Amino acid sequence: MKVIGISGLENFIDFKKAAWPGLEEREYRIAQGVDASAALVIDGNLVVAADQARFCVQTRTAQFPIDAIRFCLSEAGITIDAIDEIAHGFDFAPYRVLYAQDSVSTELYRRVLSRSALLDQVSRDLPGFPEEKVFAVSHHRAHAACAAFTSGWDECLVVVSDAMGEIEGLSVFDFHDGELERIRSMYARDSIGMLYSLVALHLGFEFSTDEYKLMEMAAYGDPSRFRSFFLEAVELRDDGSVRIPLLRLTNTRRDREICAAARVSLDQKLVRRRLPGEPIEFIHEDVAAAMQECFERVILHCCEHFARETGLRKVVLAGGAPLQAAVKKKLIRSRFFDVIYISPAGGDDGAALGAALYRTSLTQAIPARRPQAPLITAWPDAGFDPDLRAPQTSFGS
């Protein structure tokens, strides 16, 4: 079976610019699907993958990944006629009713998020490809599939965290016997990934691009200075979920699109926002350190709760949010898991691969494989200080 997985939501940013003129350029990037890519999977094996941005001389792009698709086909020595399915790593169809509440949302769904919008792009760039061979896979399921099917394991806990999928900010799956069973979803209004990205934006960086800068700044800051703010802002619940009242603040449709109320609250209760180009001061490093500490607290809370609930001792992390060395270190120290696997493609490029792997798994078994990214095992000696030694790692060939 030959499947091309794709990611990206063409026209999302252009739609926002037309619907809400006058925003800051950085505010238009509070959007999904800006990492278009393609991956070719044949009989459950990844053959080739590529980012669309590489072909249009951009850092990131949301445009339909036709150049990446053509590259994948060329590298495999096949044509589009040989492809059994195209799988997209977003599926907004179940939430169509949510976009019928106002005219702008309805138009956003029609022009950007709907199946018909995707089919129009396929027809434009791949004329003649049958629409019945085009499928959608929910975003977090695509992320989970990418991680689970490349882990080499038959059974594990899968935790997906990013700013948001279709409506989720964090999802937990039980992977067993080649199937992904969703056991918990947390909505974007309580997304720790979304809060992390908004704090990065507040400190003068790009949303969904520069979060790594926040993580780097955190190493120089003192988290205690703003710890109380984040302890109040992010509530850990007994059922393994979290609640973030800050993200539930809403005003107009326009304000909701750019998280305006939450950002005003950050400005009033945390620190005055830093504009790009302004000096980075100690106070900004302290904010970053407190946000990082909060993020780690949430990921550990979720992972540990569902480890106890399921009894699973292996965990896979997927999505853009958990790709941090600090998070991995805290999970190792927690001793809730014997081994941790980090998805080698945590961003939306991984969702393209995951969509293809998931669609393949519905009709045939995915071949077992050793992972192509490090396996991080738990510290073998109880009481041994993990700061004094490197983790054991195993690499695939």
PLM regions with names:
Residues 1-397:
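Short acidic/glycine-rich loops and adjacent helix/strand connectors
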